[in-house]
């Protein structure tokens, strides 16, 4: 299996700082990431949890670690589903990259995800994320709505 990458880009009619806040503020992430809020101190090496209330109890749906952060232009973190039937080892974590740039009040957000080829069930996980070519687009559309709403 060669290098598998899912990458999507969207233009958002909002300043880069607003888009950045949408990506890292737990009150904002709940609006576009299936009700999940982020829990992190956003420092390299720190844990990052995506948690939500499910059937009356707090549950972590995705966990990982912050790899790199350069507000408001770059965020890199790892992800794994702690509820999946796979060992919680570094090779099974995927990488997610947010890259932002702004020109004339319009922010370009590019999200890419890789690491599938070394991970357990990598090809299946790639196909799940790739989603017949949609990739991150459904989530990016929701991020755009939240950021543009102010």
Question: How does the language model describe each region?
Answer:
Residues 49-57:
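Short aromatic-glycine motifs in intrinsically disordered, low-complexity regions
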Residues 58, 92, 131-135:
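Soluble or luminal CAZymes and related metallo-dependent hydrolases
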Residues 38-39, 59-106:
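Hydrophobic-ligand binding "helix-grip"
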Residues 1-38, 43-44:
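Hydrophobic ligand-binding cavity/cleft-lining segments
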Residues 2-16, 67, 101-111:
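Aromatic-glycine hotspot motif
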Residues 79-84, 112-119:
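Short, solvent-exposed aromatic-acidic interface loops
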Residues 115-150:
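A conserved amphipathic terminal alpha-helix motif
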Residues 19-20, 29, 48-50, 66, ...:
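Hydrophobic pocket/interface hotspot
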């Amino acid at each position: 299996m060669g290098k598998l990458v899912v990458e999507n880009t969207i233009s958002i009619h909002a300043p880069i700082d607003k888009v950045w806040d949408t990506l890292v503020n737990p009150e904002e992430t709940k609006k576009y990431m299936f009700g999940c809020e982020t829990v992190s101190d956003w420092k390299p090496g720190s844990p990052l949890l995506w948690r939500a209330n499910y059937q009356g109890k707090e549950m972590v749906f995705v966990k990982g670690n912050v790899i790199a952060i350069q507000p408001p232009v770059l965020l890199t973190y790892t992800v794994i589903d702690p509820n999946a039937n796979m060992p919680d080892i570094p090779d099974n974590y995927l990488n997610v990259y947010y890259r932002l740039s702004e020109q004339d009040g319009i922010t370009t957000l590019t999200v890419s995800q890789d690491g599938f080829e070394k991970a357990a069930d990598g090809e299946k996980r790639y196909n799940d994320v790739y989603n017949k070519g949609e990739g991150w687009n459904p989530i990016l559309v929701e991020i755009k709505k939240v950021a543009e709403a102010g």
